[in-house]
């Protein structure tokens, strides 16, 4: 299925889920405080500064239900609602000073300490620091690329370089097994957190958490085209298989590193979880029109 067809398929289904929305106006606010007032647990200027200064998503990414930033924020708000006394501070695309080896970086790690990476959201809860990397619709229309050559060069690593290079090569050799689950991005984030693990000594446990969107049976039942249903169901099943295999690989790396206080997990949230919080907002209609269907 091509991207245009997939976009149309999702649009039709979401319109059925929310039949009272006309999707005809164009009144979306510039200030996301109006749309997400419940997210403003920190001063607005500080939050916008994190986004503007980060290397990742720009400030307006917070509007987009199909952006990784937005999905990670939704995940956080669900936890915040369930654990109001336990969450300790949200960070939006906060610069955490983690070097990554990327093609656009001229100097190789570990010498280039200027390069900073962005995780969508990270927070502390129950003596555990969660680093959240999220994906919304990307697995349904994108593919996974192999690690660049820099990740295969042992000179670019610090502690336990042999282990990291071994798994970097193993990952690339089996990259076809992760055609739609972005294992390479998770590998990079895990490496980055490991390289700066001393920063997190104040917290006894670390979790790299991959958050994804669950396409429910209710949503699939709203899709008219049998061909589209077949495509999405197969893609969903494949994603589940690749995700399980990827999480297993990442935790094997952690085990070999004897990194006892770290782990990798995956958690799904469906459309009701993600959209329910803002459905009654006066700007929800245009929000959905602009961004939900702008894959």
Where does each model-flagged region fall?
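Catalytic centers of nucleases
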Residues: 112-128, 212
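Active-site beta-strand-loop-beta-strand hairpin of nuclease catalytic cores
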Residues: 122-131, 194-200
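A short, conserved, highly charged catalytic patch centered on acidic carboxylates
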Residues: 121, 135-145
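Polybasic (Lys/Arg-rich)
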Residues: 222-295
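Acidic, metal/cofactor-coordinating or nucleic-acid-engaging core segments within structured domains
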Residues: 141-208
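Nuclease-adjacent, charged terminal/linker segments that flank catalytic cores
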Residues: 1-109, 295
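A short acidic (Asp/Glu
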Residues: 142-144, 193, 217-226
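Short, solvent-exposed loop/turn segments at secondary-structure junctions
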Residues: 95-100, 108, 128, 136-139, ...
